[in-house]
Amino acid sequence: MIMQTSSVAEESSAKEVEVKKQVVSNPQLGIEIGLLTGCQDRPYAFGLAMALISKGVDLDIIGGDEIDSRELHTTPRLRFLNFRGDQKKQGNIAMKFWKLLDYYAKLIRYAARCKPKVLHILWNNKVEILDRSILMLYYKAIGKKIALTAHNVNQARRDAKDSWLNRVTLKIQYQLCDHIFVHTEKMKEELCQDFDVVEKAVTVIRHPVNDAFPDTELTPTEAKRRLGLKDDEKAILFFGRIRPYKGIEYLLDAFRLLPADEQAKYRLIVAGEPKKGSEDYLRQIRESVQRDFKEGQVILRIEFLPDEEMEVYLKGADVLVLPYKEIFQSGVLFLAYSFGLPVVATDVGSFREEIVEGSTGFLCQPGDPADLAKAIEIYFNSDLFKNLRVRRQEVKDYAHANHSWHAVAELTYKAYTKMLERNAS
């Protein structure tokens, strides 16, 4: 296991102090919001919460242990309600059922009694069909305004699992929302065309940079050492949940196509835990690695990665590769940018809008290992890689200039005020 970096506590404390300074300097009052996290995606929930609080919004954050952090208990104007607890505890089916039932009961009671007139859903909960229909109808019946961040307009279609019931319940949820946030114009277009959502009820907010993880004084050289790599080895990283639509098999094929005389210098790291239901896909990946590569060429770290280990991978790698078959946008891209790591990605979704070729990364065709291998070669022969120690800061600067949480908070705050104005009238 990778050793924890020594400055994690100091980094977290510094972020907390900065947030408190912003809160004190902004005395604006009057807006109270209930942020429903679905007990997942802590970086997004944390980033949005801190940005909204800096604008003077009072927040209730509803979640579980996976969302929890010290700042959620010490930041002014923020109340963290841990309704879900530890979702990873082992137990029989009956115990899991009762825990889930208890969570929904707490959520229903909260909605009935809470001060916030606006509930902002970041993610649905475990029983999505229930969340999209009955829970939405309940929120509206008790007079709540509903905002929703649709990170994926129709995830089931992307995963080839679409159904009539999925589309109907999605339409119910989208139609009952007072406002919806999406990350790209293409997502807005699909939302309006496929689910008859009115355009003025949708705001496009560019996916913000993911800066919720510690970024210490750890150097790339030290990070490589912790990963078991030599400083002159070229480290290619795939990072994130292991799922079929992410195209890891194409990355393995592309890795085999890299120049034979350079093979000894390349290392591929696949790091992340599998999404439930992706066990067969993971088995195929493991078999391919064992069959087609020499020992040590491909490093599989198939496990949950603690926050303090994120920077080890993102500083130790020389490039992040996203060989996705299909996607609208990816938070992993912006996590890489927050550490100044360039990205090679397939030309799907919004990647063409988010990757500046030659400056923050390169694009290739989806489902084409040869083109992916070519893009990786182009990257390692480019000035972007040859001057990576300097160019990392430029990638960071680009990300914070174009994908700031401040901009997200501005647009989100405006939507909240309009919703409340309509409620008052």
Annotate each predicted stretch with a short phrase:
Residues N26-G30, G38-F46, M50-Y103, I108-A111, ...:
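N-terminal strand-loop element at the rim of the active site
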Residues K186, P208:
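Carbohydrate-associated surface elements
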Residues K230-K246, L252-F255, L268-I269:
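Conserved donor-binding/catalytic core segment of Leloir-type glycosyltransferases
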Residues L282-E311:
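Nucleotide-activated donor-binding/catalytic signature segment of Leloir-type glycosyltransferases, i.e.
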Residues V312-F328, L341:
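Acidic donor-binding loop of glycosyltransferase active sites
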Residues P342-A345, I355:
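Short hydrophobic beta-strand element within catalytic cores of glycosyltransferases
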Residues E357-G358, F362-P369, I378-L384:
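Conserved acidic donor-binding segment of nucleotide-sugar-dependent glycosyltransferases
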Residues R389-K418:
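A charged, aromatic-enriched C-terminal amphipathic alpha-helix characteristic of glycosyltransferases
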